[in-house]
């Protein structure tokens, strides 16, 4: 079985026998219609795109209620197009890995063209210009990571041929402006708060610079700032899409699916003709479009207003997912775990995050109305985190912890303050923060060194806890005041809100020698 069999019509009975879901629509007809009247271009040809936005559109096409595909453009790693898209007629296989052990396999046929978004690829760039000049184009979208929205001063000086993604997109928007100032929606689908504002700021930066340099008329800047023409909606996306997994690769090979190998590009992108991803997914988008949009609600997208998108983001980041991740990462690293799913089999750790979420954070959760916080956190604890197919590691999640604590825990503490709630209800959140001081020593619960994940404040914060030793006996913990009063790290001065002394007391227990992390965790979780 090969993906190219689908175009050739050479489909054996094996596809159905092995449980592979094939497209229910006329792939060639959709391709022709999309080429003639494109509606959607997506920048970022990585795994998350194929596993989520492209798969949603595939579901919409399978419904028979839509007839246009998506054109993908890659602005960074062009090998992905050459090696993971074009040899397979832009088809891919989505392998959905469920926590129950069940596996769904679906051919994704919604991507009709794959293009390299750079001037050095003349034909591809000319095609992108043609697409951006098309009145039918409704939306361009992105999964290029938060770093992809960066604007480098040097790139602003390259005129109308910048090399960074946002510069290229602005150049293409200029082509659309010249074609009649046609309307378009510019939609980030990256996992970062207020993502539409990041795209907007970048586009405005390039357009403003070009006007200043006399390269484009002032009307172009007015065009991208005119919300009747161009909009930059916010969205909240949530789905884990790891690298191609060796276990999945073997399972596909055993099925007789031949396109089962991993591709590693020179830029160290890990891709493949298949994508493995978790079953749970959320995509909530601000419904602010100027030229219509593809009906992605047919594939499960939730459209709402900007305020609701923001509430969903806060629900996830401050209560229902991210705080649990950070709690597990700090303690998981100290207890020697390398897989989040394995941590979920540890009763202390599982109870730890359950009680943080349900007992301590949920009383101040931001309820968006359109998604139930209890259902969301239930899916996290019961399906997502225990999923053995998701090889996520506490070491990865612990990266940049100093930049995450304020939003993931500080906001909850501030909400308790603002509402006049009893902060004695906060026990396990203080235990997470006490654990951070112990984590910074770089010693696990057996007092063996472990590699601390990268963090911009690591050396500075380690210097604060350096006087402390992991050993029994009396020692002076007053150095911790310099840590727990840091509003830049925790979002609040923990002493000013009445939690500093409680956290110090817990830290003393965690520093009491080998086995103290486990003993302290067990004590407080059981008592809670």
Feature names for model-found ranges:
Residues 1-43, 47-528:
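Substrate/ligand-engaging "lid" and interaction regions
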């Amino acid at each position: 079985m090969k993906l190219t069999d689908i175009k050739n019509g050479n489909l054996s009975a094996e596809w159905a026998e092995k449980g592979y879901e094939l497209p229910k629509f006329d792939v060639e007809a959709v391709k022709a219609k999309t080429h003639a009247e494109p509606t959607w271009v997506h920048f970022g040809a990585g795994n998350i795109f194929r596993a989520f936005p492209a798969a949603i559109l595939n579901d919409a096409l399978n419904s028979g209620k839509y007839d246009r595909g998506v054109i993908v453009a890659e602005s960074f790693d062009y090998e992905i197009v050459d090696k993971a898209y074009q040899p397979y007629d832009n088809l891919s296989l989505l392998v959905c890995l469920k926590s129950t052990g069940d596996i769904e396999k679906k051919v994704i046929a919604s991507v009709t063209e794959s293009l390299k978004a750079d001037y050095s690829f003349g034909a591809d760039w000319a095609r992108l210009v043609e697409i951006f000049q098309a009145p039918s184009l409704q939306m361009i979208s992105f999964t290029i990571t938060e770093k992809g929205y960066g604007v480098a001063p040097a790139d602003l000086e390259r005129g109308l041929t910048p090399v960074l993604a946002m510069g290229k997109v602005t150049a293409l928007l200029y082509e659309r402006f010249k074609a009649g100032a046609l309307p378009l929606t510019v939609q980030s689908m990256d996992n970062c708060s207020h993502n539409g504002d990041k795209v907007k700021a970048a586009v405005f930066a390039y357009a403003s610079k070009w006007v200043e340099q006399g390269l484009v008329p002032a009307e172009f800047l007015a065009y991208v700032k005119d919300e009747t023409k161009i909009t930059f909606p916010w969205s909240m996306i949530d789905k884990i899409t790891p690298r191609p997994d060796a276990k999945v690769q073997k399972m596909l090979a055993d099925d007789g699916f031949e396109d089962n190998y991993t591709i590693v590009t020179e830029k160290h992108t890990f891709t493949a003709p298949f994508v493995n991803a978790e079953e749970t997914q959320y995509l909530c988008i601000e419904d602010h479009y100027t030229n219509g949009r593809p009906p992605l609600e047919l594939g499960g997208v939730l459209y709402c207003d900007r305020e609701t998108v923001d509430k969903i983001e806060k629900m996830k980041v401050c209560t229902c997912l991210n705080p649990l991740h950070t709690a597990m990462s700090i303690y998981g690293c100290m207890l020697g775990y390398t897989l989040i799913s394995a941590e979920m089999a540890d009763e202390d750790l599982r109870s730890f995050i359950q009680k943080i979420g349900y007992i301590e954070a949920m009383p101040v959760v931001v309820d968006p109305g359109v998604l139930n916080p209890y259902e969301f956190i239930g899916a996290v604890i019961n399906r997502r985190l225990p999923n053995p197919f998701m090889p996520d590691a506490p070491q990865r999640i612990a990266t940049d912890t100093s930049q995450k604590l304020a939003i993931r825990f500080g906001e909850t503490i501030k909400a308790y303050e603002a509402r006049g709630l009893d902060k004695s209800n906060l026990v396990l959140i203080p235990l997470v923060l006490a654990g951070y001081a112990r984590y910074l020593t770089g010693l696990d619960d057996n007092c063996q060194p472990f590699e601390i994940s990268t963090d911009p404040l690591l050396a500075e914060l380690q210097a604060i806890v350096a006087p402390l030793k992991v050993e029994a006996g009396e020692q002076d913990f007053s150095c911790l005041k310099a840590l727990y009063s840091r509003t830049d790290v925790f979002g609040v001065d923990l002493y000013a809100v009445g939690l500093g002394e409680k956290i110090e007391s817990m830290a003393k227990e965690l520093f009491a020698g080998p086995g103290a992390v486990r003993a302290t965790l067990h004590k407080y979780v059981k008592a809670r």
